[in-house]
Amino acid sequence: MTFGETRTRVATRHALIAPDGHVPSVLPGISGAVANVIISPAMGANVTQLLIAFEEDGHAEFPAGDLETCVYIMEGGCVAGIDDASEPLEKGGFVFAPAGKRLELSRPARGTKVTVFQKYFDELEDVPGPAPVFGNEKNVEGQPFLGDPDARLKVLLPDTPSFDMAVNLFTYQPGARLPFVETHIMEHGLIMLEGEGVYRLEDSWYPVTAGDAIWMAPYCPQWFVAMGKGPASYLYYKDINRGPME
């Protein structure tokens, strides 16, 4: 019995979603899996973030349409297919399916868990749309964030005008932190992958640990410090490469 206690907090411009409050949803196209809608437009977000835990016979299909989709393999592995192309993905793997492309996840290993980010594609005039992407974070070199070698950022998707979505992996050594409180137009959806720390969101300070998810609306002041005896890392989404009036 929890006696009504939870670390989850849903505010107007930010949210911390702790795993103790997850309630699965039945979603079209997803079978043999437990799916949780972590972030969605129902809370005011412009991005949807799903957490899907597959059984061995699980399957997920995201139909072609106006939504673009990025999937990150947190545990296990599966086969990802975009139209006629497919690749096996293991832990740390990711796949990006542009709007207009069908994405399928099949043949998951036991214990496979994925995070999914989806948003409506914001087309840019005279700029071609993005191409599909398959990869693994192991093959992406982490760069010191603003010169700090203890805070390393991996940019998983191409940072070109074709893409209006970024998905990045941020890893901090114990004691490393963001160098200032960020306040910007980009929206974030985030999930802690390992370790622990403290996240400042607006005027609230939250202890966070692996499995916690965070939504940050545009201009939500935000700051993070890694604490504990091991590294802390999180995966996050942000919208990029579009003007404020588009």
Task: Briefly describe each language-model feature range.
Residues 66, 86, 99-124, 218-244:
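Ligand-binding loop in jelly-roll beta-barrel domains
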Residues 79-81, 105-106, 173-175, 194-201, ...:
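Long compositionally biased, domain-poor regions of proteins
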Residues 37, 134-206:
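Surface-exposed interaction/gating patches
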Residues 18-19, 31-38, 48-65, 155, ...:
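Conserved short histidine dyad/triad with adjacent acidic residue
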Residues 1-45, 109-164:
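A short, N-terminal "cap"/entry segment at the start of jelly-roll beta-barrel domains
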Residues 56, 65-83, 185-202:
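Glycine- and acidic-residue-biased ligand/ion/polar-headgroup-sensing regions
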Residues 84-99, 203-218:
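Short acidic-glycine-tyrosine-enriched beta hairpin
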